[in-house]
């Protein structure tokens, strides 16, 4: 690659602009389409094989992910959180699959785009805020009022709580974006060094070993970042349900 950041450049394939929306097809659009095909295809294969031959590896993987997400919801939110299972399951698979897809050589890392992660984070926060007003009404605003505080401190703490709430989507988005960006840049740098050092025979093997090791590390980070993203989302949901 000519540039270190070339792998994060967004290509425009087709311009489609309607009266109200710009629905042009870009690299992000293509990879989101692939994401849907992969996730739906994986579960279709799992169900198809389960019908023909009973238990299979695909089914076991699906069940492991299902149980992992359910346990996470019960741990962070409790039984009321099961209502959010379809959303949390979809969110986890969305982030995890995009993270893993970005590890494929010469591919595009969708979660390495701040625009994508911020759009996802702000949509989540708007959605759970609307839900908070729906279940609590005007009492939802009590989430910004700490209990047991001296009256003269209340305005300052309410301001801090509001700012903390407003900044949540930014921290959620930047955390995922920064980790994926840094990891892929590191692999790129080590890969370029490995190609350069190949001319030194056995010395050139060492960087390639590092590349492979970092690829496995990035695979773990891909899962970890999906876990953290979903975990923080559940914590925010729990805060809204319990108003604290």
Curated annotation (Swiss-Prot):
Keyword match Membrane: yes
Coiled coil segments of this chain: none
Membrane topology: Multi-pass membrane protein
Subcellular locations according to the entry: Mitochondrion inner membrane
Family of the protein in this entry: Belongs to the ATPase A chain family.
Subunit composition and interactions: F-type ATPases have 2 components, CF(1) - the catalytic core - and CF(0) - the membrane proton channel. CF(1) has five subunits: alpha(3), beta(3), gamma(1), delta(1), epsilon(1). CF(0) has three main subunits: a, b and c.
Protein name: ATP synthase subunit a
Gene3D superfamilies: ATP synthase, F0 complex, subunit A
PROSITE patterns xref list: ATPASE_A (PS00449)
Membrane as UniProt keyword: yes
Entry's transmembrane regions: 20-40, 81-101, 113-133, 140-160, 176-196, 202-222, 223-243
Purpose of the protein: Mitochondrial membrane ATP synthase (F(1)F(0) ATP synthase or Complex V) produces ATP from ADP in the presence of a proton gradient across the membrane which is generated by electron transport complexes of the respiratory chain. F-type ATPases consist of two structural domains, F(1) - containing the extramembraneous catalytic core and F(0) - containing the membrane proton channel, linked together by a central stalk and a peripheral stalk. During catalysis, ATP synthesis in the catalytic domain of F(1) is coupled via a rotary mechanism of the central stalk subunits to proton translocation.
UniProt-listed PANTHER family: ATP SYNTHASE SUBUNIT A (PTHR11410:SF0)
Molecular-function annotations in GO: proton-transporting ATP synthase activity, rotational mechanism
Entry keyword set: ATP synthesis, CF(0), Hydrogen ion transport, Ion transport, Membrane, Mitochondrion, Mitochondrion inner membrane, Transmembrane, Transmembrane helix, Transport
Pfam families reported for this sequence: ATP-synt_A
GO CC terms of this entry: mitochondrial inner membrane; proton-transporting ATP synthase complex
